[in-house]
C-alpha cells in the first residue's frame, strides 16, 4: 500500500510539474508575469511593512534605539547576502533545469542550496555572538548606540541559520514558478512579527531586545511554513539524501548567485560606511539623530522598491523557464514589459514621496527636528533618481537569470558599491551631510548610465536568437 501511495504521489508531482511547464511556456507573457508577480509583490510589501512597523515601535523608545537597529542592518545585509546567494544561485539553476525537463538535477540542487546556508548560518551566528560588541562597533555604533545595537543583535544571531535558509527556500519556490507558497511563508512570518512587536517591546517591557526576539521568532515560524511548502505536490522536494556538496553544484550556485552576493555584500560595506560618515559629519550632539534619519530613509525606500522588486521576481521564473526552453522571443517580450511597468510606477511613486517626505519621516520619530530635516532631504534626493531604477533592476535580473554571471555581477555592484561608496566618501568630504544625503541619487544615475548599453546589447542578442530560432 505504501509503495502504491508513493507511486501515485510521484505521478501527481510529475503531472503538476508538466502542467506548470506548459503554463510557463505557452500562456501569454504579460498575463503570466502579472500572475507570478502578485504573490511576490504581496510578500515583499508585507515584509517591508513589518520592517517599517518595527522601526515605528522602536522609534517610540528613543532616537538611540532607532540608531542601534540601524547599525544592525549591516549584519542583516550579511544574512541577506548569503541567503540570496544560495537562493538565487540554486533557484535560477532549478528554473532552467525544469525548463529543460531535468527533474533529478533540480532536486539535488534544491537540497544543496538549502542545507548549505543552514550550516553556514549556524557557524556565522556562533562566531558573531562571541564577538558581539566589537562587531557592533565595527558596524558604526558609538558609545550611546552600542547597548541598543547589542540588544538587537543577540536574538538575530541565534536565528541566523533559519533567516539565511528561509531566503533560500523563498527564492527556490519563486523561481520554480510557485511563488504562492513563498508568499504564504514570508507573509505569515511578517504578520506574526507585527503582532509580537508591541507585545514584546511594550507589554513585556523588553525594549529593543523585544523587537529582536519578535523578529527571530517570526522568522523561524516563516521558515517552517516555507519548508512545508516545498513538500507540496508540484514543488521540488528537499531531501537530505539529495544534498550534494560537489564542485559542480557550488559552481552553478556561484554562477547564478554571485551577482546577489556581490550586491548584498557591498550593501554591508555601504551601510557601515554610511553610518560612520553620518556620525563623522553630523552636527555635534546629533550623531544618533543623523544615523537614525538614514535608517528611516532606508526603510521607506525599501518599501518603495518592494513593488518593483516583487514585479521583477514575477518576471524571473518566466524568463528562466522560457530561456531554458529556448523561447527567446518570450524572454524579450517579458523583459520589455517588466521595464515599462516598473518605470511608469516609479515615476508616479517618486513624485508622491517627494511631496510628502517630511510627513513620512516624522511618522517614525516626530519629536526630533534634526532627524526630520536630514531624513527629508535624503529621501527627496533619492526620489529624483527613482524612475531610472526600473530598467536597471530588470536588466540585472535578466542577466542573472539566464546565467550571464559577470554582466549581472558588474551591474549588481554598481548601485551599492562601485558608485555609492565613492559617492559617500567624496561627496561628504566636499559638502558634508548634504553630500551624504545626495550620494545615493548620484550612484543611481551612474548605475543607469552603466546599465543602458548592457540593456541595448541583450535586447539585440535576444532579437537575433529569436529570429534564428524561428
Enumerate the language-model features and the residues they cover:
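Small-residue hotspots at the loop-to-helix junctions and early N-terminal turns
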Residues: 63-74, 149, 153, 212, ...
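Small-residue-rich hydrophobic transmembrane alpha-helices
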Residues: 66-126, 163-182, 291-357, 389-411
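Hydrophobic transmembrane alpha-helices of multi-pass small-molecule transporters
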Residues: 78-81, 193-197, 223-227, 303, ...
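Short runs within selected transmembrane alpha-helices of multi-pass transporters and secretion channels
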Residues: 87, 156-174, 182-190, 211-224, ...
